[in-house]
């Protein structure tokens, strides 16, 4: 078993933000949220998050993860000082500690598992994750022997010309045998330019220490500013989209499409350009989504087409057409074989099967039965200035163009609403309702001067 500590105390001044750096969003999760997400596959014995700047905000953002234990680093005096804060919490612990940075969001769970496995199999005092990168300028170098045993960690400015040819860098991820680390932590010194306590000094004080290379150096990319945040987002998106294409999903122009990690796509889904899929979204087989569509926290059935549409927190049934320029939101449910056409908005609406609202309509707080046809320009007037009211429309009912249904109101089954009507009272089954003034034509009309 292993205990995990995530360092999340830094301010991140280069982000130029009041938001703590580790809480900046990246494709559906915060930076630290991604780190903790990958940790779950390790099934750690305990999980510590070391907080400092914006600690209350970090606690609040992670409040849905009750397994986390928060430890405060009141003064941010370096990575070694951060890990020192664990000493009172792990007095009798004899196992291993995995130390991660909360601003390195792209690490994979299997990479961490491999690091722990190597560490335990070799009975190391410490095992560090390293990477071979094409341009290591500015990074500290990790010098090892032929068996990957650590000889030295050297800052870039202190490297000789020969040492600068070494492209192996420290990723800042460590697995320690805790009793050995705990013995050296109290003796760390801050005699450096930053007057901080470095965890690398603890590594240099331990033996044996082994280095393990990560297979893909992009995994260890950190985020210190908005440019690096954007770069990390591109790596994450490429990873997600490649996996979906290999799973049988067609992406037309992948560079213009974004898909969050929490989205689920069935085989034979087609995603058109400029489409964005977010949150807990699921899309059924054979559906064609886009171009120009945003879907968030919604369930889309099989063989749905949605073009130039915004769909949030809703459900769309099979063989339904949505768009162009439709907006479906707030727990709307659309059954199978429906059509939601151009410039139609649904809000908290439930539509039965084979129901059509083809153009220029607003249906809010409304329940529609099967085979309903909503004429162009029909709206439900659901708000009286104080509260929202429901509209109920029975199966087989048809509304004429430019109708207004003033809620609360109920239309029965097979009702026909004449075009231009303003309906303010309930209508029984099989009725025709005409709620408009009779047209008056006055020939040869000459207005008074």
From Swiss-Prot:
<keyword id="KW-0133">Cell shape</keyword>
<keyword id="KW-0963">Cytoplasm</keyword>
<feature type="binding site">
    <location>
        <position position="347"/>
    </location>
    <ligand>
        <name>UDP-N-acetyl-alpha-D-glucosamine</name>
    </ligand>
</feature>
<dbReference type="GO" id="GO:0016020">
    <property type="term" value="C:membrane"/>
</dbReference>
<feature type="binding site">
    <location>
        <position position="376"/>
    </location>
    <ligand>
        <name>acetyl-CoA</name>
    </ligand>
</feature>
<comment type="function">
    <text>Catalyzes the last two sequential reactions in the de novo biosynthetic pathway for UDP-N-acetylglucosamine (UDP-GlcNAc). The C-terminal domain catalyzes the transfer of acetyl group from acetyl coenzyme A to glucosamine-1-phosphate (GlcN-1-P) to produce N-acetylglucosamine-1-phosphate (GlcNAc-1-P), which is converted into UDP-GlcNAc by the transfer of uridine 5-monophosphate (from uridine 5-triphosphate), a reaction catalyzed by the N-terminal domain.</text>
</comment>
<feature type="region of interest" description="Linker">
    <location>
        <begin position="227"/>
        <end position="247"/>
    </location>
</feature>
<feature type="binding site">
    <location>
        <position position="224"/>
    </location>
    <ligand>
        <name>Mg(2+)</name>
    </ligand>
</feature>
<protein>
    <recommendedName>
        <fullName>Bifunctional protein GlmU</fullName>
        <ecNumber>2.7.7.23</ecNumber>
        <ecNumber>2.3.1.157</ecNumber>
    </recommendedName>
</protein>
<feature type="binding site">
    <location>
        <position position="419"/>
    </location>
    <ligand>
        <name>acetyl-CoA</name>
    </ligand>
</feature>
<feature type="binding site">
    <location>
        <position position="140"/>
    </location>
    <ligand>
        <name>UDP-N-acetyl-alpha-D-glucosamine</name>
    </ligand>
</feature>
<dbReference type="GO" id="GO:0031470">
    <property type="term" value="C:carboxysome"/>
</dbReference>
<feature type="binding site">
    <location>
        <position position="362"/>
    </location>
    <ligand>
        <name>UDP-N-acetyl-alpha-D-glucosamine</name>
    </ligand>
</feature>
<dbReference type="Pfam" id="PF00132">
    <property type="entry name" value="Hexapep"/>
</dbReference>
<comment type="pathway">
    <text>Nucleotide-sugar biosynthesis; UDP-N-acetyl-alpha-D-glucosamine biosynthesis; UDP-N-acetyl-alpha-D-glucosamine from N-acetyl-alpha-D-glucosamine 1-phosphate: step 1/1.</text>
</comment>
<keyword id="KW-0548">Nucleotidyltransferase</keyword>
<feature type="binding site">
    <location>
        <position position="224"/>
    </location>
    <ligand>
        <name>UDP-N-acetyl-alpha-D-glucosamine</name>
    </ligand>
</feature>
<dbReference type="GO" id="GO:0008360">
    <property type="term" value="P:regulation of cell shape"/>
</dbReference>
<feature type="binding site">
    <location>
        <position position="155"/>
    </location>
    <ligand>
        <name>UDP-N-acetyl-alpha-D-glucosamine</name>
    </ligand>
</feature>
<feature type="binding site">
    <location>
        <position position="436"/>
    </location>
    <ligand>
        <name>acetyl-CoA</name>
    </ligand>
</feature>
<dbReference type="Pfam" id="PF12804">
    <property type="entry name" value="NTP_transf_3"/>
</dbReference>
<keyword id="KW-0677">Repeat</keyword>
<feature type="binding site">
    <location>
        <begin position="382"/>
        <end position="383"/>
    </location>
    <ligand>
        <name>acetyl-CoA</name>
    </ligand>
</feature>
<keyword id="KW-0961">Cell wall biogenesis/degradation</keyword>
<dbReference type="GO" id="GO:0071555">
    <property type="term" value="P:cell wall organization"/>
</dbReference>
<comment type="pathway">
    <text>Nucleotide-sugar biosynthesis; UDP-N-acetyl-alpha-D-glucosamine biosynthesis; N-acetyl-alpha-D-glucosamine 1-phosphate from alpha-D-glucosamine 6-phosphate (route II): step 2/2.</text>
</comment>
<feature type="binding site">
    <location>
        <position position="73"/>
    </location>
    <ligand>
        <name>UDP-N-acetyl-alpha-D-glucosamine</name>
    </ligand>
</feature>
<feature type="binding site">
    <location>
        <position position="103"/>
    </location>
    <ligand>
        <name>Mg(2+)</name>
    </ligand>
</feature>
<dbReference type="InterPro" id="IPR025877">
    <property type="entry name" value="MobA-like_NTP_Trfase"/>
</dbReference>
<feature type="binding site">
    <location>
        <begin position="78"/>
        <end position="79"/>
    </location>
    <ligand>
        <name>UDP-N-acetyl-alpha-D-glucosamine</name>
    </ligand>
</feature>
<dbReference type="GO" id="GO:0009252">
    <property type="term" value="P:peptidoglycan biosynthetic process"/>
</dbReference>
<keyword id="KW-0511">Multifunctional enzyme</keyword>
<feature type="binding site">
    <location>
        <begin position="7"/>
        <end position="10"/>
    </location>
    <ligand>
        <name>UDP-N-acetyl-alpha-D-glucosamine</name>
    </ligand>
</feature>
<keyword id="KW-0808">Transferase</keyword>
<keyword id="KW-0573">Peptidoglycan synthesis</keyword>
<dbReference type="InterPro" id="IPR050065">
    <property type="entry name" value="GlmU-like"/>
</dbReference>
<dbReference type="GO" id="GO:0043886">
    <property type="term" value="F:structural constituent of carboxysome shell"/>
</dbReference>
<feature type="binding site">
    <location>
        <position position="329"/>
    </location>
    <ligand>
        <name>UDP-N-acetyl-alpha-D-glucosamine</name>
    </ligand>
</feature>
<dbReference type="GO" id="GO:0000902">
    <property type="term" value="P:cell morphogenesis"/>
</dbReference>
<feature type="region of interest" description="N-acetyltransferase">
    <location>
        <begin position="248"/>
        <end position="449"/>
    </location>
</feature>
<dbReference type="GO" id="GO:0000287">
    <property type="term" value="F:magnesium ion binding"/>
</dbReference>
<keyword id="KW-0460">Magnesium</keyword>
